Amino acid sequence: MTITLKSEADLAKMRVAGRLAADVLDMIAPYVVPGVSTAELDRRCHDYIVNVQQAIPACLNYGSPPFPASTCISVNHVICHGIPSEKTLQNGDIVNIDVTVIKDGWHGDTNRTYLVGDVGVLGRRLVDITYEAMWRGIRTVRPGATLGDIGHAIQSFAEAERFSVVREFCGHGIGRGFHEDPQVVHFGQPGKGLTLEKGMTFTIEPMINAGKAALKILGDGWTVVTRDRSLSAQWEHTLAVTDDGYEIFTLGAAERERFSPTGHQK
């Protein structure tokens, strides 16, 4: 495992990339409505990243087989890596949009789950609990804490709410690379795993299912779905370990009204 501790100059670049990624999710929010296709949402995000932000969408042509879009858009029982298509969103859907922007060689990665129209009680509760689970993990971050502390905070909260945590996919280190060490799993035991140090940068991005945790990957090689077709939600932020806690690079506009980058409520 090779972990690159970031300098202050590096972190300044990551703040820019993270803010751009968050801005994409703010920009697209008004368009997430019944009747819009996920392909149209992807096109809007792509155009904004390339033409307005003068940045690069990291997902496009990433991996093997090459991912065919600039964003991952995952609807209802799709856990992650949903491929945008001409299929339209329906009233009551939940939809996750995952964006990674490259600016001046540095990555900013964030995602959020949106409510489409009038969403039922279970869907709204799942989205809210997943958001809070992400924050439970984030709030454990400080020098001397461990990856197990993060995972335990997420897992214990989600399971107490009678939801399940996806184990096969996780957060990750990030910087000049899209996916760097370490892997940040969303389950674990307190005090176990890698000890956090100032200058580490990574994502926390729990995927929480309303049903069981079991999943399968579809034939396209990318789309991950719940095996029992239960709803799944996800939220993600990119952050750095600081002297005494953390700094989040990907807060959206509404979050910036409520929280400082260090997570303190305003």
Regions found by a protein language model. Give the residues of each.
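Active-site neighborhoods and metal-handling regions in enzymes and metal-associated proteins
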Residues: 1-266
